[in-house]
Amino acid sequence: MTPPPPKRQKRDEYRKATAEATSQSGASDVAEIKLPKKKYYRQRAHANPFSDHHLKYPLSPAHMDWSSHYPAFVNPDPSHINLAGARRLLKDVEVVDIGCGFGGLLIGLAPLLPESLIVGMEIRVSVLEYVTTRIQALRAQQQKLRAATATATAASETPSQQQAQIDGKQANANAAADAASPAPSTDTEHMPTTLVPGSYENISAIRSNTMKFFPNFFARHQLSKIFICFPDPHFKARKHKARIISETLNAEYAYALRPGGLLYTITDVEEYHHWILRHFGVELGAEEESEEKSTSPNANANAGVRELFERVSEEELEKDECVRVMKEATEEGKKVARNKGNKYVAVFRRKTDPEWPA
């Protein structure tokens, strides 16, 4: 009797079978296209951002090849290429999810922002492979459903009415699915019954170390939204330097954000929430308060951050659908809701660059 295969072999076999099933776009049964299961893509919760990972990154934003990530948005004119010789896109990437994890926010934002290109940045290999496979499966599902809908529409006597009915159901069905779908269903979800705006062609994920190479991917004022959802809190004081929110990184985020752009943050750790507010100049720490009282020369240490960002009011956040998706669609957000924990949200708007003094 042969022993059962080891876990690593089972994971590799499952991943290979899933990739083959997704790539076979000519299959007749759309129900065969299933989303990947997380249990075959397990990895440690942390990755050291200071290690020298084997990462590929462009020399500059003008050298980045986005054509393989967004094939539906590639410029049809082959003469339009970037400095690396890759095909250009019809539009630039303008929404970034830093530390995208298993891609819950990407999936939730895709139908909400169908005209915007969204990218997730993740440093862990297995997690990125899961997200990539998940996006490919969702695209294949939408492609099959779109073909089936087109066939049914052609055979119908009133195609315009049928298409209008389908288009009218898209937004409501997708919003209801995002709000009501439980976390376990994301691993076993089968073929959807309605088309999704954008067909998930506007989302992708890349492996990158944001703390080191963020400016290599995005040009000045390129982005309209940046999401940092449930980042690693790094509780130990000696690990605080690895936090994704810092004065140095905030300056890089401000460089890539266009004036009026938004930076979204959410965490379930209250101490980290106050850390975020302090590093965006909204709150003062104990040392800064004492320096401010003593009129020390270092009292304006966060003056630069205050000139670049302002906090968005709670009234505006209640009207922002991206905040709802950030709370409900992410895997960490669902876990916090199951555990009845608190979610601390802070959104900051990029100010207009101050004018040079005359």
UniProtKB/Swiss-Prot annotation:
PROSITE patterns from the entry? SAM_MT_TRMB
- Could you give one GO CC term from the UniProt record? tRNA methyltransferase complex
Q: Which GO terms describe its biological process?
A: RNA (guanine-N7)-methylation; tRNA methylation
For this UniProt record, give its keywords in alphabetical order, as a comma-separated list: Methyltransferase, Nucleus, RNA-binding, S-adenosyl-L-methionine, Transferase, tRNA processing, tRNA-binding
Q: Which Enzyme Commission number(s) are listed?
A: 2.1.1.33
Query: Which Pfam family name is an example for this entry?
Result: Methyltransf_4
Q: Which reaction does it catalyse?
A: guanosine(46) in tRNA + S-adenosyl-L-methionine = N(7)-methylguanosine(46) in tRNA + S-adenosyl-L-homocysteine
What GO annotations for molecular function exist for this entry?
Answer: tRNA (guanine(46)-N7)-methyltransferase activity; tRNA binding
Catalytic residues of the enzyme: 232
SUPFAM superfamilies linked to this entry: S-adenosyl-L-methionine-dependent methyltransferases (SSF53335)
Subcellular location field: Nucleus
**Where is the sequence biased in composition, kind Low complexity?**
151-186
Q: What does this protein do?
A: Catalyzes the formation of N(7)-methylguanine at position 46 (m7G46) in tRNA.
Q: Tell me the protein family, please.
A: Belongs to the class I-like SAM-binding methyltransferase superfamily. TrmB family.
Name recorded for this polypeptide:
tRNA (guanine-N(7)-)-methyltransferase
Annotated source species: Aspergillus fumigatus (strain ATCC MYA-4609 / CBS 101355 / FGSC A1100 / Af293)
